[in-house]
């Protein structure tokens, strides 16, 4: 499936905003807690996603890609749950729709990178 440059740009914008939000939230989390660990893994996954969308030449191990995939699928799944409860046309509905679209775009690139390692 081909992804347009517009979809990539939208995904990058959302990922950059999510990274900033996660990094800011992480500062308030106590190290060693489950929330802190989740934040660390999510930030790493979002950085990998950004790198893949920018077509930067950085080699990721299959394990790094697999771990990122788990986190990105989790973000998409939680967003799908939120979308199901959001009022159509609301800001929340729009936000979750954009997150889901961005994760779908990223997962296409991530799956291609994983296939390249296979």
Regions found by a protein language model. Give the residues of each.
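Terminal, compositionally biased segments
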Residues: 1-9, 13, 98-101, 105-118
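Short, charged, amphipathic alpha-helical segments
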Residues: 34-44, 66, 70, 91-101
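Intrinsically disordered, low-complexity linker/tail regions enriched in Pro/Ser/Thr
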Residues: 2, 33-54
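Short amphipathic alpha-helical heptad-repeat segments
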Residues: 7-23, 39-42, 64-80
